[in-house]
Amino acid sequence: MRKEKDNIGTLNLPDTVVYGIHSLRAVNNFPVSGERINPNFIKAYLQVKLAAAETNFKIGLLDNKKYECIVKAIEKLILETNKAIEETDNTIFSKVIVDPYQGGAGTSLNMNINEIIANTALELSGKNFGDYDLIHPIDDVNLSQSTN
């Protein structure tokens, strides 16, 4: 188990899960429909995150190492999402765990996407999930964006 901390407190997450504390809180707080987010919507979200990373790099807010890590992670996640769209592999659904009707302005989905990008970037860099010193879901992946 790994421990992750946010402004509310600390939670334990299995070492093997790619999502983080905000996603887990959302699932516990908003267990609405049990349905999955449409993979086309996940892909669109990932494409927006890619554009944000590219922009943040171009204007000097992300250094080259963080930028490359984030881009590689997003590219990997887009490939997984494409497989879900083609209905050949559902791996992405073990990562994007929030309910489509998770209440509010999309904060839970945004944080779920931020966490899986950050943790995938960490994994590709040989780091453990949740070791956010290299890539942080809010400070790096969500840089220059609202959490909503």
Task: Report each predicted region and the residues it spans.
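Conserved, well-structured ligand/cofactor-binding cores
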Residues: M1-N148
